[in-house]
């Protein structure tokens, strides 16, 4: 299969020479980084490539019929009854002005012509199947009255209403909390078995693919580079990219000092900048000039395996069992003096009552943070962990001065700052506490060059006596975050996600920050980029002796880089200790539930889900 998009100037190949087979009742995982073409394959199967997208080679066959040759009426019938797709953002798939029940019964009424009563009975059945409580209330609710996890379950229920033969899931759990994600994945697995549905599961999370799929197809820059059964690819990988991908994720045992992650060098090629021969060539450790870049490389069958293929010329020359070369080990930096002290911090919000919050005219109190107390030292990484709504981002806002504390104290070098809003804080205090945000795409000014944005931060922090001094410091900051100096003249739109996040980090360190609050700084980035950005943060921390408050719900990364961990639940601290203490028994029950829900990309580790109940508010 080859799919291209056409602009006025050129043809942009999005998918080239791609082949995958999904057997009845089988789950196939499609793995790769942003831009590798995995969602394009899904849209190709749905025949929904838009005006400028076209299948330019190969066929998409469903139950023996070529989907590009069927009539629009037949295609509508197939989409309604036999192929269903679940998208990444559940709210985008639901009509906000229609009750859930009405949205669900539409499917069988339109496509199968059943009566409204029968459709309603089926809707009740699928709501029970997706393990949602209080069926009657759910069917009478609007989408905004449900949580993210409940919305995603409704979208799955909607897809199952037509009892499809093929279910395509495009990153269905990306926006969900780890315990909700684990419950949704378990649900998808069980329903696949119950309904005998085949699944095409698109994700960049190797742990999820391991838990849900039978076969895996690894994609890179528009091509499938390795396909095979889960055990073949995970345990006997035969492509340099698959190997590099596994080395850049924090599996159990990875440690920032003794076993650092190995980031994939270089950048992902844009569709019109692909190299000759092997697309992965410029980033590959085994690249050979003259052979790897001389001709297009076909998929090669691996001897002794029925369905294991790899797109690598040197497949028989590389020693795939060779131990991983350990990159330079780092000395553990001992923590210094206490920089930040939080003492019985409380943050309450008064919410005006309405139909949702009791009778009108009264006020309800939302306790976002309740008696938080802890210390953070120089050169230390303290991870703050918890699900959405646990109060970790509220705490970050109070620390930054964007909100003021209701009660309690925040001491920065023994100076109280908890009740001082950011506009009343001294410049030095503002420079001392900086933040790296979750989404690098939203935090840079699109109309300013990279250099100007960093210089502006230096001006705000009153750094340097002249423009030349500030320009020099800006170039030093680009060096610090390992970006070429010529990036100073580039606009944000010319940068990849990982490069934008590096600019965000450079800006945070512009005023010589003592404390950096990193709010999920790598969750919006690809797996291979995550390793590079995480290691960069660690390296800068060693040089600058910064205190890093790392807010995250990804326990794999927390385990890898933190010195101490604080677990939050509904505004309270439920556990606080060194990383080894928190990640070893005895656990607090909530910590254990969080740990059990983390998908691990290792076939020798068997996960068990302890918690699938809803989080209270």
Regions from the language model: what does each represent?
Residues 33, 47, 176, 180-259, ...:
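P-loop NTP-binding/switch modules centered on Walker-like glycine-rich loops
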Residues 46-50, 400:
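Helix-to-loop junction immediately C-terminal to a conserved catalytic motif
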Residues 54-66, 408-419, 429:
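Conserved ABC transporter NBD signature motif
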Residues 66, 118-137, 246, 468-486, ...:
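Conserved ABC ATPase "signature" region
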Residues 67-84, 110, 232-237, 269-275, ...:
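ABC ATPase NBD coupling module
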Residues 141-146, 150, 491-495, 499:
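Conserved ABC ATPase signature
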Residues 229-339, 352-360, 578-617:
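Charged, flexible cofactor/metal-binding loops and thiol motifs
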């Amino acid at each position: 299969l080859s799919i291209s998009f056409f602009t006025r100037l050129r043809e942009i190949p999005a998918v080239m020479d791609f082949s995958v087979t999904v057997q009845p009742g089988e789950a196939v995982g499609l793995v790769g980084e942003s831009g590798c073409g995995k969602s394009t394959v899904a849209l190709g199967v749905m025949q929904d490539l838009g005006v400028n997208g076209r299948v330019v080679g190969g066929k998409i066959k469903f139950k023996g019929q070529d989907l590009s040759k069927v009539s629009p009426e037949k295609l509508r019938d197939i989409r309604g009854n036999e192929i269903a797709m679940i998208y990444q953002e559940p709210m985008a798939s639901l009509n906000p002005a229609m009750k859930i029940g009405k949205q669900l019964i539409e499917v069988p009424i339109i496509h199968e012509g059943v009566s409204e009563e029968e459709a309603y009975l089926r809707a009740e059945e699928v709501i029970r199947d997706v393990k949602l409580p209080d069926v009657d209330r759910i069917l009478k609710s609007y989408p905004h009255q449900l949580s993210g996890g409940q919305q995603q379950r409704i979208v799955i229920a909607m897809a199952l209403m037509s009892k499809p033969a093929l279910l395509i899931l495009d990153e269905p759990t990306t926006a969900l909390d780890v315990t909700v994600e684990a419950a949704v994945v378990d649900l998808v697995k069980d329903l696949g078995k119950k309904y005998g549905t085949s699944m095409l599961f698109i994700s960049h999370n190797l742990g999820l693919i391991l838990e849900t799929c039978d076969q895996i197809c690894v994609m890179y820059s528009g091509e499938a580079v390795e396909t095979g059964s889960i055990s073949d690819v995970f345990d006997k990988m035969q492509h340099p990219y698959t190997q590099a991908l596994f080395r850049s994720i924090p599996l159990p045992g990875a440690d920032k000092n003794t076993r650092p992650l190995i980031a994939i060098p270089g950048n992902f090629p844009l569709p019109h900048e692909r190299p000759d021969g092997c697309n992965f060539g410029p980033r590959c450790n085994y690249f050979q000039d003259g052979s790897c870049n001389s001709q297009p490389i076909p998929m090669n069958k691996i001897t002794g395996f029925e369905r294991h293929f790899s797109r690598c010329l040197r497949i028989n020359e590389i020693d795939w069992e060779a131990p991983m070369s350990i990159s330079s080990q780092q000395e553990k930096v001992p923590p210094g003096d206490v920089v930040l002290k939080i003492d019985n911090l409380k943050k309450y919000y008064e919410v005006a009552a309405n139909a949702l919050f009791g009778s009108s005219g009264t006020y309800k109190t939302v306790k976002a943070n309740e008696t938080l107390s802890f210390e953070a030292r120089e050169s230390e990484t303290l991870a703050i962990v918890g699900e959405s709504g646990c109060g970790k981002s509220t705490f970050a806002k109070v620390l930054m001065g964007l909100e003021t504390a209701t009660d309690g104290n925040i001491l920065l070098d023994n100076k109280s700052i908890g009740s001082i809003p950011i506009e009343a804080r001294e410049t030095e205090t503002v420079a001392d506490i900086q933040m790296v945000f979750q989404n690098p795409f939203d935090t840079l000014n699109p109309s300013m060059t990279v250099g100007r944005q960093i210089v502006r931060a230096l001006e705000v922090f009153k750094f340097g006596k002249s423009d030349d001094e500030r320009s020099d410091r800006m170039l030093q900051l680009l060096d610090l975050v390992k970006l070429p100096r010529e990036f100073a003249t580039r606009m944000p739109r010319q940068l990849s996600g990982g490069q934008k996040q590096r600019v965000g980090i450079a800006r945070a360190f512009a005023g010589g920050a003592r404390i950096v609050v990193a709010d999920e700084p790598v969750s919006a980035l690809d797996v291979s980029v995550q390793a590079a950005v995480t290691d960069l943060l660690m390296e800068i921390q060693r040089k600058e002796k910064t205190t890093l408050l790392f807010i995250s719900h990804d326990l794999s990364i927390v385990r890898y880089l933190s010195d101490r961990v604080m677990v939050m639940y509904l505004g309270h601290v439920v556990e606080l200790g060194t990383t080894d203490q928190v990640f070893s028994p005895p656990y607090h029950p909530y910590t254990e539930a969080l740990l059990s829900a983390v998908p691990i990309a290792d076939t020798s580790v068997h996960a068990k889900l302890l918690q699938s109940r809803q989080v209270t508010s």
